[in-house]
Amino acid sequence: MYISRNLEQWNAFLQMLKIAFEENKAQEFLTLLLTADERDAVGLRLQIVSQLIDKNMPQREIQQNLNTSAATITRGSNMIKTMDPDFMQWMKQHLDLIEKN
């Protein structure tokens, strides 16, 4: 699994993110820290992961559908390979629920 270059800062971010969600401030917190382009990139990464998990289409088709680079799709695919299978099943379950709504 990927380990942040500065684990202390990453953990501080995760703690603040948790607090922001608990206090219903996640939108403001992430808007403060992420530019519009970064928020779009996170959304794109989520779409990539969702489509890669489904395994219904080749990476090239995902690339064309999402209008992104092959390298971006490959980064998502490579990260999935490093993740615990139980976590990826959890992701799929929740992504499926989101897509149904």
UniProtKB/Swiss-Prot annotation:
Q: Biological process GO annotation list?
A: negative regulation of DNA-templated transcription; regulation of DNA-templated transcription
Which UniProt keywords are given for this protein, alphabetically ordered?
A: Cytoplasm, DNA-binding, Repressor, Transcription, Transcription regulation
UniProt keyword Transcription present: yes
Family matches, as InterPro entries = Trp_repress, Trp_repress_bac, Trp_repressor/repl_initiator, TrpR-like_sf
- Transcription listed as a keyword: yes
Coiled-coil-forming residues are none
Any Gene Ontology CC annotation: cytoplasm
Q: What Pfam families does the record point to?
A: Trp_repressor (PF01371)
Q: Where in the cell is it found?
A: Cytoplasm
SUPFAM superfamilies membership: TrpR-like
One example GO MF annotation: sequence-specific DNA binding
Q: Which Gene3D superfamilies match?
A: TrpR-like
Q: Which residues bind DNA?
A: 59-82
Give the protein's function: This protein is an aporepressor. When complexed with L-tryptophan it binds the operator region of the trp operon and prevents the initiation of transcription.
How is this protein organized at the quaternary level?
Answer: Homodimer.
What PANTHER family does this protein map onto? TRP OPERON REPRESSOR
Q: What family does the entry list?
A: Belongs to the TrpR family.
Q: Can you name this protein?
A: Trp operon repressor homolog
**The gene coding this protein:** trpR
